[in-house]
């Protein structure tokens, strides 16, 4: 038994010496005693290639490259293995989760956390950590019993010890964990004759766990020889760069002392790896205190990018340069990263440059459609058929793959389900999914066409097929009692779904099309699923378990599944993390993401046991645990050192100034340290570099076209652009090989989001030969022509959801107030509190069930909202009573409809207008309330409009003037046209155009002492004060509020009097009768102008900006019009907001309709 240690800094030939030594032994005696090379898992393939690719060897029967676990299996093959079943990672996790749930009531600290999946994962990691460092439950229990400690720490350790002991008891004599198998391996070593003849080499490690040190001790004791290779200069200082490997050397020395053998050290001081002085100087001077600056020869580069995406694009371009100009192969290049955000960027950017690569990392299977289907299926059962997991299940397209356009059918089903509030067992109600119900989806009245009917029948059939599969699954699972029964039921359900055949067919198609990686994913998905089922049966067998617990445990197992992808080719760029990737002797290594916070990154304790608790336990129990965060923090420089010394020829460091979430980032302090080692090592700012060297952007044909587009766009905006881009454009344009897609890019240069004006025929096809429209439609056009085109031309509708919208609330208030008003004939002043409550309850019972398929009775929240609506109605009726008490105007008509041809005697006639093209304009709508007052054979009318939103309960005469607010003038015009149908006198004049805000007022007080019941009632009444415009006629003023007198301001209408009895300018919103008529006439002209523009085919993305606000903020069509302030601001429309609308309207002439031209 001999022990050798090869010690030296990076690149000094330690591993080369080891490989040479092994190869010499193999050549001398190919069938001699075994040679074992122990390396980390991620290094074994690379080392095997070193032997396979040697032309003098072409492989080996004598040498094996193994990691510790594989070595243990090799010994077990010789001496016999354990009788227990080995637990996989997933099986261990599932068992511990189940134990935690069973023992939850006995936990002291973690009782509330036990129900969360993440807790069992943390607990599993902690138990595995204890096993790696040979800490048993007995160690924990003795420590807890013997030591005085904080209550929280004691409770924590007791909880962990409880689960740990229970776990050990469960697996005793039946199962074995990976860590326990290594202990068994140690016990088997003395029996192995093969091991006694073996030469052992250990390379690629920088630290070991306690159990691994015990294995090394056994190897030293029983093998013929052991050689360990460590990257260290032998300095044992805890602040040394090589603290971590020097700690390993110290442990090896202790083992040697215990075994009473000496270590034959061989120091390697000569640098062999690096081909130039730059890399040699970087390695030698990285950790020195006194810096020796030398001139940089260009083999070290530091790149600064604005964003991470720009950073990886530049790395891709430089890889192409290495391949094309330096004749490197892809396998000569490596990229090392630390920030996980870069993994996504590699997948999205490198394929654009046709760069083959392999990322040495495991990806979770949880987001694969098959796995998402299974997990959603589980959640459907767990959640009692809630809508979200059901929709996720449908959208995976796994159970619906047999349907043509299945994604479209699922989208239609989703729309219907969200509109009708389908959840729970309502999914099983076939009546709810009657095809006729789909006709009303998003539309109040619509008859299905034959194509639509066929489509919706397919939707219903698809839904039924999926429901049948879920019901079969639920039935099979509900009949099971033991875990084995559940696993069997699950597998049989998958066969019932025909999932195995479906997956194998898809796998074969992918293989046939050359997509081998995706095909391999399907294989691994299915094998992983079967493995989890096998693990469940192995661990729990015939143990009784509830279906709920089984599905929880099963889901825990699925969480552990990961893809392990084999490289698809040998010649590819190696990508890995700086901490784990094993890339040696690459010609060029790129270290990306070299930012402060990433390199070095702050190390924080993430285990259940804190660093302080860990240190206390180590000191008091005389054991060693995994390194604490402060120790790991000291090793950050070593991580950087190892990463940057992997290259032979060139090292490129890069960093970005902005993170993936838009946060600012700083350069790594290690880069400042590296820069200080060299003269003339400047940081290259990528945008500035490309500005000076535009040709450096032209490395890949497809990406060059994209960059060319950006350059030409800058040129169009009169920015200075290098002539090289104009030359590049001509070359690409004239090359049949390169110009594919160029026309499309060029068309984007002049894109300004401009719509096409509709022709006369198309306008009539879209809008009809006459315009039948509400006032709001015209107001919508004034907001933005494209909004009108999208809503009434293309008839685009937002998806209706089973939730109360603002307009629903307004409809409810209108319906309730109409119901009550008709019951009392508009005489609000007769109401008392008891009558208000009675009528409110009656109205709500009648109206609420009709809202959104009885939405307001669907949940506790909506039932609470119903009560709130009732409270608002009661408060509103109290205000209406107050207003009716002091007004001579009487409410006479409620929710009165108007149209060109009334359907009943109660409806009003709307005069037809005509566009400039001769197309009729038929306006329709509904007036909330019409109040009347008659004196001396003259009738005065008030238009009252209920608004549930404060913002819309204001009459802005400037908006009225410009046609942005047309409602009130239109309603007054309709009433004045229908005096006979309303039963009014021959002479009818406007009274007021008023808004009533339906709401629940909030009164603010500075302190409790300010609260006075009388004042509170007054303040509440003021919150319901009508707003709008009132006829300045004295008869109207007197009738609106009978209390009006000098120095009095009404609290029910916008009218106030000065001391002399004149109208107050501050407290009054009034206009004379002629002015009101002029506004009405101008409103008609606005209708004609707007309708004419519609029929002219205007569809511009041209929102009307008013008071610095755009209607786009509340528009649902932004995803269609793509309005962009950078492109469309020149088309924003504005109006002169400084005008006095009452003065401006005086230029309008009034025709005979209002009593002669004025």
UniProtKB/Swiss-Prot annotation:
Cofactor note: Binds 1 [4Fe-4S] cluster.
GO molecular function, one term: ATP binding
Binding site for [4Fe-4S] cluster: 784, 1112, 1115, 1121
InterPro entries associated with the record: ADDB_N, DNA_helicase_suAddB, DNA_helicase_UvrD-like_C, P-loop_NTPase, PDDEXK-like_dom_sf, PDDEXK_AddAB-type
EC number: 3.1.-.-
Domain UvrD-like helicase C-terminal: 269-583
Class of enzymatic activity (EC top level): hydrolase
Binding site for ATP: 8-15
Required co-factors: Mg(2+); [4Fe-4S] cluster
Keywords for the protein's UniProt record, in alphabetical order: 4Fe-4S, ATP-binding, DNA damage, DNA repair, DNA-binding, Exonuclease, Helicase, Hydrolase, Iron, Iron-sulfur, Metal-binding, Nuclease, Nucleotide-binding
Positions of the UvrD-like helicase ATP-binding domain: 1-275
GO biological process: double-strand break repair via homologous recombination
PANTHER family documented for this protein: RECBCD ENZYME SUBUNIT RECC (PTHR30591:SF1)
Family under the similarity heading: Belongs to the helicase family. AddB/RexB type 1 subfamily.
Miscellaneous comment: Despite having conserved helicase domains, this subunit does not have helicase activity.
Its job: The heterodimer acts as both an ATP-dependent DNA helicase and an ATP-dependent, dual-direction single-stranded exonuclease. Recognizes the chi site generating a DNA molecule suitable for the initiation of homologous recombination. The AddB subunit has 5' -> 3' nuclease activity but not helicase activity.
Subunit and interaction comment: Heterodimer of AddA and AddB.
Protein name in the entry: ATP-dependent helicase/deoxyribonuclease subunit B
Gene name tied to this protein: addB
């Amino acid at each position: 038994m001999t022990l050798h240690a090869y010690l030296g800094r990076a690149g000094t030939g330690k591993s080369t010496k080891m490989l040479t030594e092994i190869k010499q032994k193999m050549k001398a005696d190919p069938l001699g005693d075994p040679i074992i090379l122990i390396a980390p898992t991620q290094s074994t393939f690379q080392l095997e290639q070193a032997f396979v690719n040697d032309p003098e060897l072409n492989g080996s029967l004598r040498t094996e490259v193994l990691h510790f676990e594989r070595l243990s299996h090799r010994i077990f093959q010789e001496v016999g293995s354990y009788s227990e079943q080995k637990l996989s990672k997933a099986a261990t996790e599932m068992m511990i989760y189940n134990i935690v749930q069973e023992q939850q009531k006995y936990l002291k600290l973690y009782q509330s956390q036990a129900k969360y999946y993440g807790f069992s994962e943390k607990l599993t990691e902690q138990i595995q950590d204890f096993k790696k460092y040979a800490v048993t439950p007995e160690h924990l229990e003795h420590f807890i019993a013997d030591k005085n400690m904080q209550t929280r720490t004691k409770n924590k350790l007791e909880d962990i010890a409880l689960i740990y002991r229970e776990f050990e008891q469960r697996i005793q004599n039946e199962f074995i964990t990976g860590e326990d198998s290594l202990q068994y391996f140690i016990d088997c070593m003395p029996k192995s004759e093969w091991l006694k003849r073996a030469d052992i080499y250990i390379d690629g490690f920088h630290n070991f766990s306690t159990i691994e040190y015990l294995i090394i001790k056994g190897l030293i004791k029983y093998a013929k020889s052991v050689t360990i290779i460590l990257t260290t200069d032998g300095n044992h200082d805890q602040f040394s760069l090589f603290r971590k490997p020097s700690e390993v050397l110290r442990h090896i020395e202790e083992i040697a002392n215990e075994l009473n053998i000496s270590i034959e050290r061989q120091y390697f001081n000569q640098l062999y790896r690096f081909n130039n002085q730059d890399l040699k100087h970087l390695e030698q001077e990285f950790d020195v205190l006194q810096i020796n600056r030398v001139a940089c020869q260009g083999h070290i580069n530091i790149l600064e990018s604005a964003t991470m995406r720009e950073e990886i694009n530049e790395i891709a371009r430089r890889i192409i340069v290495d391949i094309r100009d330096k004749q490197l192969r892809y396998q000569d290049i490596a990229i090392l990263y630390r920030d996980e955000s870069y993994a996504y960027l590699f997948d999205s950017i490198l394929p654009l440059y046709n760069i083959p690569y392999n990322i040495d990392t495991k990806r979770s299977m949880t987001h694969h459609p098959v796995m998402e289907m299974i997990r959603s299926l589980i959640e459907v059962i767990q959640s009692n058929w809630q809508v979200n997991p059901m929709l996720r299940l449908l959208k995976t397209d796994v159970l619906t793959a047999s349907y043509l356009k299945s994604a479209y059918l699922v989208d239609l089903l989703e729309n219907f389900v969200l509109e009708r509030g389908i959840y729970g067992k309502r999914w099983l109600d076939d009546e709810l999914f009657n095809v006729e119900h789909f006709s009303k989806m998003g539309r109040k009245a619509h008859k299905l066409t034959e194509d639509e009917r066929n489509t919706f029948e397919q939707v219903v059939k698809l839904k039924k097929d999926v429901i049948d599969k879920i019901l079969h699954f639920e039935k099979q699972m509900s009949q099971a009692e033991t875990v084995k029964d559940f696993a069997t039921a699950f597998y049989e359900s998958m066969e019932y779904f025909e999932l195995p055949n479906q997956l194998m067919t898809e796998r074969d198609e992918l293989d046939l099309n050359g997509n081998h990686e995706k095909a391999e994913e399907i294989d691994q998905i299915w094998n992983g699923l079967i493995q989890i089922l096998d693990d469940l049966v192995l661990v729990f067998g015939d143990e009784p378990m509830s279906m709920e617990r089984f599905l929880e445990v099963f889901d825990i197992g699925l969480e552990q599944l990961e893809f392990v992808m084999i490289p698809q080719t040998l010649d590819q760029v190696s990508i890995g993390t700086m901490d784990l990737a094993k890339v040696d002797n690459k010609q060029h290594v790129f270290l990306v993401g070299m930012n402060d916070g990433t390199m070095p990154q702050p190390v924080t304790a993430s285990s259940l046991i804190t660093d302080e608790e860990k240190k206390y336990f180590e000191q008091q129990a005389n054991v060693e645990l995994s390194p604490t965060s402060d120790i790991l923090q000291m090793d950050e420089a070593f991580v950087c050192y190892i990463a940057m010394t992997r290259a032979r020829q060139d090292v490129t460091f890069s960093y970005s100034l902005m993170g993936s979430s838009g946060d600012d980032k700083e350069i790594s302090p290690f880069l400042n340290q590296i820069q200080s080692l060299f003269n003339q090592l400047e940081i290259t700012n990528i945008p500035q570099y490309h500005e000076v060297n535009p040709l450096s952007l032209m490395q890949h044909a497809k990406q060059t076209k994209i960059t060319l587009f950006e350059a030409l766009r800058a040129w169009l905006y009169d920015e200075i652009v290098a002539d090289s881009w104009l030359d590049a454009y001509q070359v690409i344009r004239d090359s049949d090989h390169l110009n594919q897609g160029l026309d499309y890019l060029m068309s984007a240069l002049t894109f300004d989001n401009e719509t096409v004006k509709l022709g006369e025929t198309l306008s009539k096809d879209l809008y009809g030969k006459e315009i039948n429209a509400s006032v709001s439609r015209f107001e919508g056009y004034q907001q933005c022509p494209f909004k009108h085109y999208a809503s009434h031309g293309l008839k685009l509708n937002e998806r209706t959801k089973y939730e109360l919208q603002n307009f629903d609330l307004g409809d409810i208030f209108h319906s309730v107030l109409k119901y009550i008003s008709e019951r009392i004939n508009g005489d609000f002043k007769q109401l008392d509190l008891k009558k208000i409550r009675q009528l409110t309850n009656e109205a709500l019972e009648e109206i609420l069930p009709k809202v959104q398929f009885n939405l307001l009775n669907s949940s506790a929240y909506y039932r609470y909202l119903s009560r709130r609506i009732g409270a608002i109605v009661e408060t509103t009726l109290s205000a209406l009573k107050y207003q009716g008490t002091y007004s001579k105007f009487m409410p006479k008509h409620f929710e009165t409809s108007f149209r060109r041809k009334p359907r009943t005697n109660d409806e009003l006639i709307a005069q037809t207008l005509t566009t400039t093209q001769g197309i009729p304009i038929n306006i329709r709508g509904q007036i909330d309330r019409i109040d009347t007052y008659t004196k001396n054979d003259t009738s005065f009318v008030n238009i009252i409009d209920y608004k549930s939103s404060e913002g819309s309960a204001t009459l802005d005469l400037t908006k009225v003037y410009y046609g942005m607010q047309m409602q009130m003038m239109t309603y007054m015009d309709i009433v004045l046209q229908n005096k006979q149908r309303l039963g009014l006198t021959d002479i009818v004049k406007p009274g007021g155009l008023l808004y009533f805000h339906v709401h629940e007022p909030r009164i603010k007080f500075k302190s409790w002492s300010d609260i006075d019941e009388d004042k509170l009632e007054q303040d509440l009444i003021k919150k319901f004060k009508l707003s709008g415009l009132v006829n300045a006629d004295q008869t109207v003023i007197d009738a609106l509020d009978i209390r009006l007198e000098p120095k009095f301001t009404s609290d029910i209408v916008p009218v106030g009097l000065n001391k002399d009895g004149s109208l107050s300018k501050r407290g009054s919103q009034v206009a004379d009768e002629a002015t009101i008529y002029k506004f009405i006439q101008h409103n008609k002209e606005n209708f004609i102008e707007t309708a004419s523009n519609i029929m002219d085919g205007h569809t511009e993305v041209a929102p009307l900006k008013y008071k610095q606000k755009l209607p786009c903020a509340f528009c649902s069509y932004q995803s269609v019009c793509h309005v962009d302030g950078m492109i469309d601001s020149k088309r924003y429309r504005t109006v002169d907001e400084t005008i006095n609308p009452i003065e401006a309207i005086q230029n309008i002439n009034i025709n005979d309709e209002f009593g002669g031209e004025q």
